[in-house]
Amino acid sequence: MKKTTLFVLSLLFISSLNAVDGVSKTDLSSLSMAEDSVPLNHSNAQKLSLKNAWTRVLSSHEGLHAQEYAIKRASKMKLAAKLSFLPQIDLSAFYVYLSNPIKMDFAGQKQPGVQKATNQIHQGLQNIQQNIPPQVLTPQIQAGIQGVMQGFGALSSTLESPLLFSKQNVVIGALSIIYPLYMGGARFTMVRIADLMQKDANEVYRLKKLSTFQELVSVYYGMVLNTEVAETLEEVEKGHYKHFQNALKMQKVGQIARVETLGAQVAYDKAHIASVKAKDVLEVSQLSFNSILSSKDDLAPSSKLEIHTEKNLPDLSFFVSSTLNSYPALKTLENQIQISKENTKLQIAKFLPQVHFFGSYLMKQNNSVFEDMIPSWFVGVAGRMPILSPTGRIQKYQASKLAELQASSEQIQAKKNMELLVNKTYKETLSYLKEYKSLISSVELAKENLKLQEQAFSQGLSTNAQVIDARNTLSSIIVEQKSVAYKYIISLANLMALSDRIDLFYEFVY
């Protein structure tokens, strides 16, 4: 009997030692995990509101800068189109070296005829001189006849030598002007097309601006969501750790079994892992936030996931009309229709005549007969009427008309799609708002339930699993509510961007 009693006492003593040892091991492992848990710290980060962040994005986003350059480029092209009404003035210079001088050899080509004509002139003058009575032939008349004969002799010798028209070196300069008087309306059409292209560049910039705002809202409130979720999970981790410590104390005094303590430890371990993952996600969102702001310093949002639940959205018709009247993509399609019409006019101009005024002032050396023959200046008018052309003018005209119909059909379909998208986004926004409001009471209920379960557990009226379930339920509802708030904000931003009413966004979000 004594041996049996001693054996039972020894078993109880050993089991008590094992329990104490298990409690100490569990306590040490949990303490090490608690030490590894790094608390959130954004105190050193610069806080930015959404408006301030948007201002920084407008000044530093390279995508927006690229579209600004596109607008400036379109403006230059518009000015270039207007300059087509100016005349074209060119200053040209020519230097030509001829293989041989330009000359005419009368003696070689017409030598017999020239000699015969010269002889006949001499013979005629001699006959005149012989037939004149001596009393009439005065010294003056005789001297005149001799002069004429000498002149014809010189002419004969001149005709017998080559006549030089131009030397081998020819240098000519010209100041020329060409001014189109009528081009079939092509120049006016090109100016209107350039103006439409500039408007289109402005609409592309507006579209890029709206999409960048949507991206900023997504990144900004994405970081807010990740921050608040990480804070919530950190609080859950602390709550599980506190509950685990209470379970350890109650196990030591024998109020609960070790399996209850192990359950509390498992819950704490899971909460710790979830908290670490949330912090990792937060670090990634921090990088995205710094990237969109083009900042190397750590920045943090100052806003919270809070929304104006008491403020009602405008009617759906307001957003639909605003979108159809001002959305940049629809404006771009409208510009494309106008550009297609102007292209049709440009194709028609190819069938019409063209009239040009031209003129030139020539600068020359005047050291040859050929250059002396060239006039110093000239002006004129030239016309051109295309009859047959291998460029496919008719087919290009037909293609431009088809482009008009294509752009018109795309605009009609785009308006239908945009109206459907606005309806969908509007209803999604209202749905998220209702869901957010409904979760407010669920959060209050979960908080009260956790409070009651913790009090009951401390009094031995509740189990460890009930406390853990109550805390996990509260955290899941809080995270769900924050996720719904984030979805509401993103949907609201999309709705405001579609209607080009970014200014209204700030009235519904803190």
Predicted regions and their residues:
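Sec-dependent N-terminal signal peptides
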Residues: 4-13
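Acidic, low-complexity, intrinsically disordered peripheral segments
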Residues: 20-28, 33-42, 90, 97-127, ...
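Amphipathic alpha-helical coiled-coil scaffold segments and their short linker/junction regions
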Residues: 54-58, 110-157, 295-357, 505-510
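Periplasmic alpha-helical coiled-coil/stalk elements that build and connect Gram-negative outer-membrane
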Residues: 3, 21, 29-33, 40-41, ...
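Hydrophobic, lipid-facing positions within transmembrane beta-strands of outer-membrane proteins
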Residues: 171-177, 319, 377-383, 425
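Amphipathic alpha-helical coiled-coil segments
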Residues: 66-81, 208, 214-233, 242, ...
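Small/polar (Gly/Ser/Thr/Ala-rich) solvent-exposed segments
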Residues: 65, 89-103, 158-168, 178-207, ...
